[in-house]
UniProtKB/Swiss-Prot annotation:
GO terms for biological process: defense response to fungus; killing of cells of another organism. It is found in: Secreted. InterPro entries: DEFL. Its main location: secreted. Keywords: Antimicrobial, Disulfide bond, Fungicide, Plant defense, Secreted, Signal. It comes from Arabidopsis thaliana. Belongs to the DEFL family. This is Defensin-like protein 276.
Length: 80
């Protein structure tokens, strides 16, 4: 029984480590904003598809909007 617990814990740890790795290529800081909706409009305005984005008002950068584009996600100008 003890061996099964270690196997289960090991499996859960591996799963958590695999799925917690970010595939984001980094922030593209665009414009200034105070809300998530403003940030989404800014990301859209720069040709980045918000369905593949994480738009975050980033206050420590002077209210800049972080348009986070994931690797492999097409830009809105690209044909899928």
């Amino acid at each position: 029984m003890s061996g099964q617990k270690y196997q289960l814990v090991s499996l859960l740890l591996i799963i958590c480590l695999l799925f917690s790795q970010s595939t984001a290529s980094g922030c593209n800081f665009k414009g200034s904003c105070r809300t998530d909706d403003q940030c989404k409009r800014i990301c859209r305005g720069h040709g980045l598809d918000p369905s593949f984005q994480l738009c975050v008002p980033y206050s420590s950068k002077g209210g800049k909007c972080c348009c986070l584009h994931y690797e492999g996600a097409p830009l809105s100008s690209e044909v899928i």
